[in-house]
Amino acid sequence: MKPLVIKLGGVLLDTPAAMENLFTALADYQQNFARPLLIVHGGGCLVDDLMKRLNLPVQKKNGLRVTPADQIDIIVGALAGIANKTLVAQAAKFKLNPVGLCLADGNLTQATQFDPELGHVAMVVAKNPALLNNLLGDAFLPIISSIAVDDNGLLMNVNADQAATAIAALINADLVMLSDVDGVLDANKQRLTELNSAQIEQLIEDKVITDGMIVKVNAALDAAKILNCGVDIANWKYPEKLTALFAGEIIGTRINP
């Protein structure tokens, strides 16, 4: 099977029991299957918590975090430090051979500033898969934070969904986006197994998909179009279902290009 990139939402990092469940499922899966796995993560909630403790303002423009030069070191510390090493520690506990990385390591991606008004925020594209191919070939579990470096050597914050998409494109992998939702629900609150672009557009127009779910669905749709394959939105709360998800079954909603 193709490798699988698992994108983790930051809320998971605030939920120790959920992390335990996730890595229990990963360990169980790796004992029974040979599919290479990678994790890509953000950690916005950790950043917000750290900024609050330091009495620093959180600025946003059109819903995107503004990252001024005097805050990028704090954000790097939260994402590439606290968040990444917390996940590495959990994976090590379950003997999963984790390696903590960022998007700049081994020239995995090319980063370009997204919008000067957002400061140290970048978009990334796939660049060099050699490091990941070597790690996966030796049965390591790469855990990659959404921190990048641009051509000028500047540290950059990257949207974690976009980072996961670039990593999946880099190694021709499938992508699963894990969060705290079961998937996309219809007007009767029943889970929809699969959706395509036209169906998503209609559900948004009908106000069935609203608010934060629009962001999640559009991120998955963007990824599906880039990867030219279905991208799953699923919940990390059900460890008994995660092993099936990692094996390719739909437990949430599959977003097709």
UniProtKB/Swiss-Prot annotation:
Transmembrane feature ranges: none
Main location: cytoplasm
Entry-linked SUPFAM superfamilies: Carbamate kinase-like (SSF53633)
Keyword Cytoplasm carried by entry: yes
Binding site for substrate: 43-44, 65, 157
An example Gene Ontology CC term for this record: cytoplasm
Lineage top rank: taxon: Bacteria
Enzyme Commission number, as recorded: 2.7.2.8
A Pfam entry, by short name: AA_kinase
Keyword Transferase: yes
Annotated site, Transition state stabilizer, chain positions: 7, 216
GO molecular function: acetylglutamate kinase activity; ATP binding
Annotated compartments: Cytoplasm
Keyword annotations of the record: Amino-acid biosynthesis, Arginine biosynthesis, ATP-binding, Cytoplasm, Kinase, Nucleotide-binding, Transferase
Catalytic activity line of the entry: N-acetyl-L-glutamate + ATP = N-acetyl-L-glutamyl 5-phosphate + ADP
Signal peptide interval: none
GO biological process assignments: arginine biosynthetic process via ornithine; L-arginine biosynthetic process
UniProt pathway annotation: Amino-acid biosynthesis; L-arginine biosynthesis; N(2)-acetyl-L-ornithine from L-glutamate: step 2/4
InterPro entries with a match to the protein in the record: AceGlu_kinase-like_sf (IPR036393), AcgluKinase_fam (IPR004662), ArgB (IPR037528), Asp/Glu/Uridylate_kinase (IPR001048), NAGK-NC (IPR041731)
Similarity comment text for this entry: Belongs to the acetylglutamate kinase family. ArgB subfamily.
Biological role: Catalyzes the ATP-dependent phosphorylation of N-acetyl-L-glutamate.
Name of the protein this chain belongs to: Acetylglutamate kinase
